[in-house]
């Protein structure tokens, strides 16, 4: 396995100062909990407070777990296990690239899958669960909108006797005051 240091890229430039401080602390052996505990002044969750240097150390030190006894072991090509390839991880707003072997990459992905299943965060179930009741909600919303629209159209004001087209029309009867109309009506 290669002894190359992992590369971390911050494409948005949000953590440039924090990354410099993390690198300085990692080289000196100090901790950088204060610089990685907030992003632009916002407090983050306890899981997100894990520093990138700590994540690198955990991944580099962890070996692949033993394969399950019931699963068939895939045939490996000679020399394939020794070759390391770059693996990119997106975590806490940063991108980290590690040179890991194929076995270690599979172990990391298997561990992430098991953690996701244990917490019930399956991608398909969340999407189906959220949108299962949407057509009924849409129907109720549409019915509410149509009933309010009907009420607005049927409850035209007393000065819109001729309908919506008569609102813009100006005649001699519409420009007179209320008292003048009343006098005309009683005189007739």
Swiss-Prot record:
Ranges of Low complexity composition bias in the record: 28-38
Signal peptide region: none
Motif Jas: positions: 135-160
KW Transcription regulation (keyword) present: yes
Pfam families: Jas_motif (PF09425), tify (PF06200)
PROSITE patterns: TIFY
Post-translational modification: Ubiquitinated. Targeted for degradation by the SCF(COI1) E3 ubiquitin ligase-proteasome pathway during jasmonate signaling.
UniProt keyword annotations, A-Z: Jasmonic acid signaling pathway, Transcription, Transcription regulation, Ubl conjugation
Renumbered residue ranges of the record's region Disordered: 20-41, 156-188
Record PANTHER family: PROTEIN TIFY 4A-RELATED-RELATED, PROTEIN TIFY 9
Protein task: Repressor of jasmonate responses.
Domain notes: The jas domain (135-160) is required for interaction with COI1.
Name of the protein described by the UniProt record: Protein TIFY 9
Species per Swiss-Prot/TrEMBL record: Oryza sativa subsp. japonica (Rice)
Species lineage: Eukaryota, Viridiplantae, Streptophyta, Embryophyta, Tracheophyta
């Amino acid at each position: 396995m290669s002894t190359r240091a992992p590369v971390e890229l911050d494409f948005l430039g949000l953590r440039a100062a924090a990354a410099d401080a993390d690198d300085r602390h990692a080289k000196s052996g100090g901790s950088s909990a204060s610089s990685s505990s907030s992003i632009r002044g916002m407090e983050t969750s306890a899981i997100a407070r894990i520093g990138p240097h700590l994540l690198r150390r955990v991944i580099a030190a962890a070996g692949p777990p033993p394969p399950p006894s019931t699963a068939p072991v895939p045939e490996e090509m000679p020399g394939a296990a020794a070759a390391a390839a770059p693996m990119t991880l997106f975590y806490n707003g940063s991108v980290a690239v590690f040179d890991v072997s194929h076995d270690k990459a599979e172990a990391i992905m298997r561990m992430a899958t098991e953690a996701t299943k244990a917490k019930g965060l399956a991608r398909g179930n969340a999407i189906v669960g959220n949108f299962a009741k949407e057509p009924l909600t849409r129907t109720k919303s549409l019915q509410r909108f149509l009933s309010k629209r009907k009420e607005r159209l049927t409850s035209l004001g007393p000065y819109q006797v001729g309908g919506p087209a008569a609102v813009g029309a100006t005649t001699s009867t519409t420009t007179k005051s209320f008292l003048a109309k009343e006098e005309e009506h009683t005189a007739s």
